[in-house]
């Protein structure tokens, strides 16, 4: 078993991160496997070295050890572009210049409605024809979307998390209708979470992806990309989320739950485990 924890250095780690990291770490160790660490820093406007240093320190304080070097997405941008080039040459991605406002206006037209998918409003396809690759055209420096009508295939994945345990089938008609043409590269990043995460999990040999249940609906996108790119499909384990007193999912802006604050108040790693039920 190979698991991983993949935080973004865009703010302090909180109790929810501690739960995710400890769960992935302990699952791998209990199975005699490997636990890997990846820094997801493709959001170059928000990722900061000081947050990375803090999260590494917090993980060590929790007693979490990882195998091998830390993988940083910022070091892998050429590999993401290479995958996009291959998809572009196959006619599976297209250029999109729509703003968020454009998409909202098109999707709310009476004849369209506004269906919601894992990434929000399902893209209405405004740029699908005009943005498609032309013979000899280089990969454009715009947002790039996946042509789900060409990419989707009958497939599925195994889920071991408590809320969704079992085999989940993925059907092309559902992907086209309920997910749509997702963004694979944002103009300002040159990639996206969806593309990077599947390439990185394959590169690191991850066999079991553990993550919060808020990402369960995105798994169909990731498995579709894995099939499309000839990558292995791992087992998925989506766990429950740590929530605040009002029942809201913790976010990095919830500084009251930051691990650094608990540490400053004298909490021990064992105290953190008790707080999160591990």
Swiss-Prot record:
A motif ('KMSKS' region) lies at residues 249-253. ATP binds at residue 252. One of its GO terms (cellular component) is cytosol. It is an enzyme of class 6 (ligase). Coiled coil: none annotated. Keywords: Aminoacyl-tRNA synthetase, ATP-binding, Ligase, Metal-binding, Nucleotide-binding, Zinc. L-glutamate binds at residues 4-8, 40, 193, 211. This is Glutamyl-Q tRNA(Asp) synthetase. It comes from Rhodobacter capsulatus (strain ATCC BAA-309 / NBRC 16581 / SB1003).
